[in-house]
């Protein structure tokens, strides 16, 4: 839909201020896309492939050379594409999508078929390109671990409906919006503390589990909770924030927590 292959059933799409339906040419000028395994001329070299696209898009030779260096293909760019590994073909496809210096890069299942080393290399190239070119990157993928490593914000979609849009904390590599904490207490105090915590206005829920007490509370309220429990002479062995990965959050939002 973002590249104009299908029309939206309702609403509108604007890319850099250009309406995709009424100003298609200018809107798509701001977009680059790599859809799974890019189609390339295997009998041509990598450079010849890029020059074919450059001529159509009026891209200078200098910009072609800059893009080749950006994706790290300068050592093999004059080899025939039929000799390229899958990872190199992905890099060449990425280079082709970057030639016109788009403001939006769309990647659809970009790491399908790549080995772990190829996935890591491709991820680093994308992150480098996004930083140097100052562009937004949309990634569509069913490989949640790769999305978690590559993206800083995710949208959970189920049956065409966005369930939530949340940030990923780059330092902890976990969902930034998560407010769960685990409170470890003695078994004798669990029920008593649960009843006390449920009275607090900044606590959404509190339940006993095998770890202790799982508490969901408002942001920046952990210190208030600890102070309240201490003032009421409850013995707390440990308290920590439970960090959830993308897969666990997906199960909660899309699958209802059922495994």
What are these regions (language model features)?
Residues 1-139, 144-164:
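ABC transporter nucleotide-binding domains
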Residues 17, 57, 186-187, 219, ...:
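Short loop or secondary-structure boundary microenvironments that flank
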Residues 42, 145, 191, 223, ...:
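Alpha-helical elements of the RecA-like P-loop NTPase motor core of helicases
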Residues 124-216:
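ABC transporter nucleotide-binding domain
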Residues 217-259:
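C-terminal coupling/interaction segments
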């Amino acid at each position: 839909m973002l590249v104009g292959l299908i029309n939206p059933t309702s609403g509108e799409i604007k890319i850099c201020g250009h309406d995709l339906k009424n100003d298609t040419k200018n809107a798509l000028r701001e977009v680059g896309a790599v859809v799974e395994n890019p189609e390339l001329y295997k009998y041509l070299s990598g450079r010849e492939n890029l020059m074919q696209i450059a001529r159509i898009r009026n891209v200078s030779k200098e910009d072609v050379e800059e893009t080749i260096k950006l994706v790290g293909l300068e050592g093999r760019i004059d080899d025939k594409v039929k000799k390229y590994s899958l990872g190199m073909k992905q890099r060449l496809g990425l280079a082709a999508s970057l030639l016109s210096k788009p403001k939006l890069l769309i990647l659809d299942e970009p790491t399908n078929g790549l080995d772990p080393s190829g996935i890591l290399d491709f991820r680093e190239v994308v992150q480098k390109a996004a930083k140097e070119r100052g562009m937004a990157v949309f990634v569509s993928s069913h490989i949640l671990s790769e999305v978690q490593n590559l993206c800083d914000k995710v949208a959970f979609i189920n049956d065409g409906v966005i369930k939530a849009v949340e940030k990923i904390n780059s330092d902890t590599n976990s969902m930034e919006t998560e407010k769960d904490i685990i409170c470890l207490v003695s078994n004798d105090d669990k029920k008593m503390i649960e009843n006390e915590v449920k009275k607090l206005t900044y606590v959404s829920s509190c339940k006993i589990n095998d770890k202790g007490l799982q508490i969901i509370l408002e942001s920046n309220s952990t210190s208030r909770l600890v102070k309240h429990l201490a003032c009421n002479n409850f013995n707390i062995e440990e308290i920590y924030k439970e960090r959830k990965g993308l897969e666990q959050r997906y199960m909660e939002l899309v699958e209802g927590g059922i495994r």
